[in-house]
Amino acid sequence: MDPTLISLGALALAGAAATVSGCAEDLESDVGSQSNPNSQVQLGPQMGNIHRYFNKAISGEPVSYGLYVAVAGSVAWALINAGLN
C-alpha cells in the first residue's frame, strides 16, 4: 500500500478522534455544570433537550479541533517530505 495513503488515513483518523473527543468533553462538562451550584453557567434546565446539542453542533468547536489536527498534520507531512526534519 502507498505510504501517502497510509499517512492520509492516519490523519483522517486523528481528525475523527479529535472531533469525537471534543463532543465527549462537551457532554461531560454539561453534566458537571448541572451538579455544581457554584457553576458560572447553570445548564440544568437544558439537560436532555435537543436544542442544547444543536447549539453545540452549530458552534463548531469539536469540528474545529479536528480541522486543527488536519492542518497541523498536513503541514508536518509536507515539511517532512520536503526534507526539513
Curated annotation (Swiss-Prot):
Protein's name in the database: Tetrahydromethanopterin S-methyltransferase subunit E
Pathway linked to the protein: One-carbon metabolism; methanogenesis from CO(2); methyl-coenzyme M from 5,10-methylene-5,6,7,8-tetrahydromethanopterin: step 2/2
Function noted in UniProt: Part of a complex that catalyzes the formation of methyl-coenzyme M and tetrahydromethanopterin from coenzyme M and methyl-tetrahydromethanopterin. This is an energy-conserving, sodium-ion translocating step.
Molecular function (Gene Ontology), one example: tetrahydromethanopterin S-methyltransferase activity
InterPro entries found in the cross-reference section: MeTrfase_E
GO biological-process terms attached to the record: methanogenesis, from carbon dioxide; methylation; one-carbon metabolic process
Species whose genome carries this gene: Methanococcus vannielii
EC number, as in UniProt: 7.2.1.4
